[in-house]
Amino acid sequence: MKYLLPTAAAGLLLLAAQPAMAANTGGYATTDGGEVSGAVKKTARSMKEIVDIIEAAQVDSKGKKVKGGAYPLIITYSGNEDSLIKAAEKNICGQWSKDARGVQIKEFTKGITIQGTNGSSANFGVWIVNSSNVVVRNMRFGYMPGGAQDGDAIRIDNSPNVWIDHNEIFAKNFECKGTPDNDTTFESAVDIKKGSTNVTVSYNYIHGIKKVGLSGASNTDTGRNLTYHHNIYRDVNSRLPLQRGGLVHAYNNLYDGITGSGFNVRQKGIALIESNWFENALNPVTARNDSSNFGTWELRNNNITSPSDFAKYKITWGKPSSPHINADNWKSTGKFPSISYKYTPVSAQCVKDKLANYAGVGKNLAVLTAANCK
């Protein structure tokens, strides 16, 4: 599927007219999605039914398009595409050239929640464009087709105030020859770009992904506030995220099996990397492939406290031929500004011991607190 996007300026004017909402997402997002007064609840059993429900919510009773949407939406998805996911798993290198499949939420600001039922699955993505007040929860996304058409699992373009929570996103961390740069067949798990800001990514289980996520599409797309918390990343290659400018706060995440690089802080971005657990990781915190506009990071209360911990947790470092900075001395290179939201991180050890009981689908949206660490 291909879509023409309105200009960023037009999208921002549309979004600016909408009131903010006030959920506690544990991060920069403050949206309840469709969980507001006047919401219409719908159930969908397929990608097409989700598309049809969203299209119907964008017009009034006379069929005239309503700016920002006619009413808030709560969509419960109960479909199962395990057969497509299993077929893709058997033909990994055949996915790149297939048509991308996805639900597009475009110019919708009334509030929308898409939430999967336990046991549901999707071989299609959710693409959020020029919208705001969007929540995606308890969705299981596997082996997205259409890498050549930017077939991300979740894509957020020019859309503030989005919450991506308690999902599972997976593919195969594998390179297929014949694709650009011998790249994998699959695109990103969660890309946040083109002016998107105030986004929270929480309690997701992301595994087998080569390019996990962008924070910014280019060296000029640099202004955003993002929070990543209580996510599990296993057997992933890079972009955790690839940060082009802006602010990234990452706390209480578990990183196990980074095969390329983790945080790549570029274009003078600033990252607060707090109370996370790292193991079996190559270049977990770095700045590279960015001439001299390196970003900075503040390292706080992670399981790694000094280079003497690297061997214990199997942390290794590589040195590319291009200019770069690695956190191989495990020291902060900058100071993160004050944070506008309240949060209470648990210890990195608790993340290691307990987070798997809370992150991903089928966990009833449960959250990890200090009381659970005992």
From Swiss-Prot:
Protein name stated in the entry: Pectate lyase 2
Localization per Swiss-Prot or TrEMBL: Secreted
SUPFAM superfamilies in the cross-refs: Pectin lyase-like (SSF51126)
Disulphide linkage map: C93-C176, C350-C373
Matching Gene3D superfamilies: Single-stranded right-handed beta-helix, Pectin lyase-like
Domain of life, source organism: Bacteria
Molecular function via GO: metal ion binding; pectate lyase activity
Pathway annotation: Glycan metabolism; pectin degradation; 2-dehydro-3-deoxy-D-gluconate from pectin: step 2/5
Top EC class, one word: lyase
Cofactor: Ca(2+)
Gene encoding the protein: pel2
Family: Belongs to the polysaccharide lyase 1 family. PLADES subfamily.
Active site per UniProt: R239
Gene Ontology process terms (BP): pectin catabolic process
Residues given in the record as Ca(2+) binding sites: D150, D152, E187, D191
Main subcellular location of this protein, as a coarse class: secreted
GO CC entries: extracellular region
EC identifiers of the protein: 4.2.2.2
